[in-house]
Regions:
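Short alpha-helix in the Rossmann-fold core of NAD(P)-dependent oxidoreductases
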Residues: 134, 145-159, 172, 205-206, ...
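Conserved glycine-rich Rossmann-like NAD(P)H-binding loop of the short-chain dehydrogenase/reductase
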Residues: 67-83
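Non-catalytic terminal and boundary segments that flank Rossmann-like NAD(P)-dependent oxidoreductase
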Residues: 1-48, 183, 298-320
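C-terminal helical subdomain
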Residues: 6-13, 21-26, 205, 251-293, ...
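The beta1-alpha1 cofactor-binding region of Rossmann-like NAD(H)/NADP(H)-dependent oxidoreductases
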Residues: 78, 96-112
């Protein structure tokens, strides 16, 4: 990457309004001469996508099947997931797998179903929502952490042998730029009723996701499976409309489209660049730091990382 391009990218990255909004991909796609997603061939690829029925997930699903992939869409609603799968473009195919990522028994059943259907070479953790009220699953785990941290960890563990057969398989996590405001916490990862705030809980979950992505990369050889996380910038999706209506009203004209938000996700699935490293965090097809603030970086210690891994393993029931 040329020095002048790196300098220009840093100028774009510095103010959030240029980096996270639609201005970012408009400038960076020209700066780096992005390869068109239409040029990739995914025939023969088997991709598991959670949260593929709306927003960024749906935009990615449409790309995957149009490029020829065999897609397994994991969704909570059978009617909606099957309807979405039936409407996705060819030449690829899509099959619905029904599960709530926050229900660990359903995650285990979904993983078994995926294996029965032939397994996968790529697993995408995209499901996730920002909820205003605190809820817990049947195991007593706060719903955001259950569905966005523990459930994905469990599914990754169960599908790891299948993913490894691709040599390398790929695991990609859709995080959020909101995690930049949150430090790494384990004892307070699940917010209590008296302190609960949906946006803060979401940010803590996303911070944990990105940290777990890096930890997975240290535990699994990149010759077997590579791990990447990314954030989409600020995109105009049904989730943003429902959970952040004021933000959407103010930023509306500058928000990215779903296709722009999903671009790097699709690229990480399709391009060979994703197989050259593991454990990275991306925005607009470039690796990014996981901390922007010294206050959050201070919380990210080796001891706390080890505690996070053990904690998630315990909640997922995957401790050996």
């Amino acid at each position: 990457m040329s020095t002048w391009k790196s300098i220009v990218d840093k100028v774009i990255e510095a103010p959030v309004v240029t980096s996270f909004t639609s201005i970012g991909p408009a400038l960076r796609s020209r700066l780096d001469d992005w390869t068109s997603l239409d040029s990739y061939d995914l025939i023969g690829r088997r991709i598991v996508l959670t949260g593929g029925t709306s927003g960024l997930g749906l935009a990615a699903a449409e790309r995957f099947t149009s490029l020829g992939a065999t897609l397994l869409v994991v969704g909570r609603s059978r009617d909606k997931t099957e309807r979405i799968c039936a409407g996705l473009p060819g030449p690829g195919t899509a099959t619905a797998v029904i599960a709530d990522l926050g229900d660990f028994d359903q995650v285990r059943a979904a993983a078994n179903e995926i294996l029965d259907l032939g397994g996968a070479d790529t697993l995408i953790h995209n499901a996730g929502a920002l909820t205003a009220d605190r809820r817990t699953n049947a195991a007593g785990v706060e719903a955001t952490i259950a569905s966005q941290v523990v459930g994905p960890h469990l599914m990754t563990t169960l599908l790891l042998p299948s993913l490894s057969e691709a040599a390398p398989g790929r695991v990609i996590t859709m995080a959020s730029g909101g995690m930049y405001a949150a430090g790494l916490t384990v004892r307070q990862l699940q917010m209590d009723d008296d302190e609960y705030g949906g946006s803060e809980q979401y940010a803590r979950a996303k911070r944990a996701q990105v940290t777990m992505n890096e930890l997975w990369a240290t535990k699994v050889s990149p010759a077997k499976v590579v791990f990447h996380a990314m954030h989409p910038g600020w995109a105009d999706t049904p989730g943003v409309e429902a959970s952040l209506p004021t933000f959407r009203k103010v930023m509306g004209p500058l928000l990215r489209s779903a296709d722009q938000g999903a671009d790097t996700l699709v690229w990480l699935v399709a391009d060979d660049e994703a197989t050259t490293t593991s454990g990275d965090f991306w925005l607009d097809r470039r690796r990014r730091p996981i901390h922007k603030l010294p206050t959050t970086k201070k919380t990210d210690t080796p001891e706390r990382r080890a505690q996070l891994w053990e904690y998630v393993e315990q909640l997922a029931g995957t401790r050996s």
